[in-house]
């Protein structure tokens, strides 16, 4: 059975749709707030963290992943104040029961957050973003090992690069190696092959 990770927006009708399809969902992902470093351009009507937390709390239990998947950040993001503000935001989502992990693209930011607040890090899993292009066992192993070297929980699943969709023998071999190394970690594929 296929399971999907889908974006979340705090719309009551959409929340009801997701709740009704919860058995087919691997989780939801969302922008943590208008000032957080994710790979999307800011929208004009980004929901507030309070709106997001309220909407997420109405969903059945499933992974709820906040996006921190920008590869490049403003210098202020990694400053003491920037890390503090980001950790306060993560802690607020945790207190609301609205966050189970983060999708990240910068190992340095992940390590900085882990070092700045081991308490927050231990509550969240760290999921490598798709821009890591996990197209080989060696690359995937290096990225997962790096995530596991922090205080964050290991990723419950990783999304393999879309290029492996075109090589079923290679995909089978890569998946076998990953499952032997991390038997509890799920594997996913990009679905937008066009």
Regions found by a protein language model. Give the residues of each.
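Active-site pocket-lining/capping segments in soluble small-molecule metabolic enzymes
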Residues: 1-143, 149, 153-194
């Amino acid at each position: 059975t296929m399971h999907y990770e889908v974006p979340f927006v705090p719309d009551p009708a959409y929340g009801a749709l997701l709740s009704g399809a919860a058995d087919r969902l691997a989780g939801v992902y969302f922008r943590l707030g208008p000032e957080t470093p994710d790979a999307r351009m800011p929208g004009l009507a980004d929901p507030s963290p309070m709106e997001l937390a309220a909407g997420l709390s109405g969903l059945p239990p499933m992974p709820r992943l906040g996006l921190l998947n920008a590869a490049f950040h403003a210098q202020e993001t990694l400053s003491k104040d920037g890390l503090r503000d980001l950790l306060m935001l993560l802690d607020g989502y945790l207190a609301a029961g609205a966050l189970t992990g983060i999708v990240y693209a910068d190992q340095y930011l992940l390590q900085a957050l882990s070092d700045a607040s081991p308490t927050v890090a231990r509550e969240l899993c760290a999921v490598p973003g798709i821009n890591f292009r996990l197209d080989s066992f060696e690359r995937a192993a290096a990225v997962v090992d790096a995530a596991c070297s922090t205080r964050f929980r290991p990723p419950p699943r990783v999304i393999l690069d879309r290029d492996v969709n075109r090589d079923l023998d290679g995909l089978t071999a890569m998946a076998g190696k990953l499952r032997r190394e991390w038997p509890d970690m799920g594997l996913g594929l990009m679905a937008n092959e066009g």
